[in-house]
Curated annotation (Swiss-Prot):
Tissue expression pattern: Accumulates in fibers (seed trichomes) during both their initiation and elongation phases. Also present in roots, hypocotyls, leaves, flowers and ovules, and barely in cotyledons.
Name of the protein: Steroid 5-alpha-reductase DET2
InterPro entries: 3-oxo-5-alpha-steroid_4-DH (IPR016636), 3-oxo-5_a-steroid_4-DH_C (IPR001104), SRD5A/TECR (IPR039357)
Native source organism of the sequence: Gossypium hirsutum (Upland cotton)
Transmembrane regions: 8-28, 49-69, 77-97, 109-129, 144-164, 201-221
Disruption phenotype: Impaired fiber initiation and elongation.
Length: 258
């Protein structure tokens, strides 16, 4: 048990340590997939397969770890982990299927980037699953648990709705297109360039509220460090590609702010 506690604490420390370098590096150099795809990053695989493989630890590792937790027989632990699993079922299974069905582009996803994402999801999947199933210590505080869970769940559900809806719009534009990109319009796309990222940031803020933990907050913090610089780069990409046709008053990711 002591060795697992040590591993858990070092993994949590790692999650916080890598957040700032991630923000700084992605501010200057974008991961080469999607709109920012470019050569020079080694062999590639199909994007749907990449998404499936690199996101999968969040599912199988959670199912592997949960039975060994002291809260395995507590229904609240299953309730709490459900939004996390629901998000990653969409990201690991449904999203790659939508990509495979609707995308005609042949540009690959760098194996090196998928490998790094796989490593992060191992780290984060371990932390979130182990916290909920074993280390969380306030399940017995009924009032606090339910207030935090319901408030966080509301934020999470709204964020996931925004995220999935925006992803569907973007995938739909790929299906309509001739291999190129189009300006997304409607909904939150009128306010920000990347409502899909805004929705995901909302989700993990809601998760931080639900778990009420340094583990949940660390994931939210890292999500911001990963997605906000990419949203900024995506907005600049749109402005450069579409010039005056792209609305200059759209923010990158947070409506009216950033």
């Amino acid at each position: 048990m002591a060795s697992d506690q040590t591993l858990f604490h070092y993994c949590l420390l790692t999650l916080y340590i890598i957040a700032l370098p991630t923000w700084i590096s992605l501010y200057f150099l974008q991961a080469p997939y999607g709109k920012h795809n470019r050569p020079g990053w080694g062999p590639t695989i199909s994007p749907p397969l990449a998404w499936f493989l690199m996101e999968s630890p969040t599912l199988w590792l959670t199912f592997f770890l949960f039975p060994s937790g002291q809260h395995f027989y507590n229904p609240k632990s299953f309730l709490l982990i459900s939004p996390f699993l629901f998000h990653y079922f969409n990201r690991t299974v449904l999203y790659p299927l939508r990509l495979a069905r609707n995308t005609t582009q042949t540009r690959g996803f760098p194996v090196s980037v998928a490998f790094m994402a796989f490593g992060f999801n191992l780290l984060n999947g371990y932390l979130q699953a182990r916290w909920v199933s074993h280390y969380k210590d306030d399940y017995e505080n009924e009032e606090l648990f339910w207030w935090r869970f319901l408030a966080g769940l509301l934020i999470f559900v709204v964020g996931m709705w925004v995220n999935v809806r925006a992803d569907k719009v973007l995938v739909g534009l790929k299906k309509q297109g001739d291999g190129g990109y189009k300006i997304p319009r409607g909904g939150l796309f009128e306010l920000v360039s990347c409502p899909n990222y805004f929705g995901e940031i909302m989700e993990w803020f809601g998760w931080a509220v639900m778990t009420w933990s340094w583990v949940g907050f660390g994931f939210f913090l890292y999500t911001c460090a990963n997605l906000m610089p990419r949203a900024r780069a995506t907005r600049l990409w749109y402005l450069e590609k579409f010039k005056d046709d792209y609305p200059k008053d759209r923010k990158a990711v947070i409506p009216f702010i950033y």
